[in-house]
C-alpha cells in the first residue's frame, strides 16, 4: 500500500498515518519528522531547514525530494508506505510520480482530509497544551503566528494538489472534521473496498 495523506497543517494527517501504520505494518514517512531529525542532528541541511521552518515557511523541493527518495529505498518500505506532509506542491507531486515510476512503483490512493481552518487553530492550540501537559517539547513552528503563515503557504502552494490528483484519478476526499475513528474507517473503506 502506497498512500498520500493531504490536508492543511493540523488536519490530522499524522494521527491517521500513525493508526494506518499500526494496522498495516508499513512506515509513515513524515517529511516533517525527517526534517526535524536533520535539524536535531544539526547537519548542514538541518540548519538550512531550521531557519525556513522557524519562519513558518516550507523547505525547498530539492531538499525534500532527496530525503523522500532515499527513505522510499529503505527496506521497511518494500511493502508500502504512507506519505504524510509530502508532496506539498504540484512540482513535488510530479517529481514523486517520476521518482516512483523510476523505482517501478505507483500510488494506491491520495486521500485529502478536508477541514475548517478556524477549527485548525483550535486543534493546534490543543496539541500544544497536550504536549506541554505531558512534559514534551513544543515544536518551534507550533505558535499562532507561524501556524497562520503555514496555512497561507498551504493555500498558495499545497491546495492545488487537489486538482492535480483529481486529474490523475487518484484523489479521494474525506471529512477531516469527523471523529478520528470515523476518519480512519472512511480511509479503510477507500483502501479496501467492500
From Swiss-Prot:
Pathway given in the UniProt record: Purine metabolism; AMP biosynthesis via salvage pathway; AMP from ADP: step 1/1
A Pfam cross-reference name: ADK
Record region (LID): 126-142
Keywords, in A-Z order: ATP-binding, Cytoplasm, Kinase, Nucleotide biosynthesis, Nucleotide-binding, Transferase
Positions of AMP binding: 31, 36, 57-59, 85-88, 92, 139, 150
Cellular component terms (Gene Ontology): cytoplasm
Catalytic activity: AMP + ATP = 2 ADP
One annotated GO molecular function: ATP binding
Annotated binding of ATP, by residue: 10-15, 127, 178
Cystines in this chain: none
Stored SUPFAM superfamilies: P-loop containing nucleoside triphosphate hydrolases (SSF52540)
Catalytic activity, EC: 2.7.4.3
Cellular localization per UniProt: Cytoplasm
Region (NMP): 30-59
Main enzyme class: transferase
A biological-process GO annotation: AMP salvage
Description of how the protein assembles with itself and partners: Monomer.
Assigned protein family: Belongs to the adenylate kinase family.
Domain notes: Consists of three domains, a large central CORE domain and two small peripheral domains, NMPbind and LID, which undergo movements during catalysis. The LID domain closes over the site of phosphoryl transfer upon ATP binding. Assembling and dissambling the active center during each catalytic cycle provides an effective means to prevent ATP hydrolysis.
NCBIfam families: adk, PRK00279.1-3, PRK14527.1, PRK14528.1, PRK14531.1, PRK14532.1
Function: Catalyzes the reversible transfer of the terminal phosphate group between ATP and AMP. Plays an important role in cellular energy homeostasis and in adenine nucleotide metabolism.
Designated name of the protein: Adenylate kinase
Organism: Brucella abortus (strain 2308)
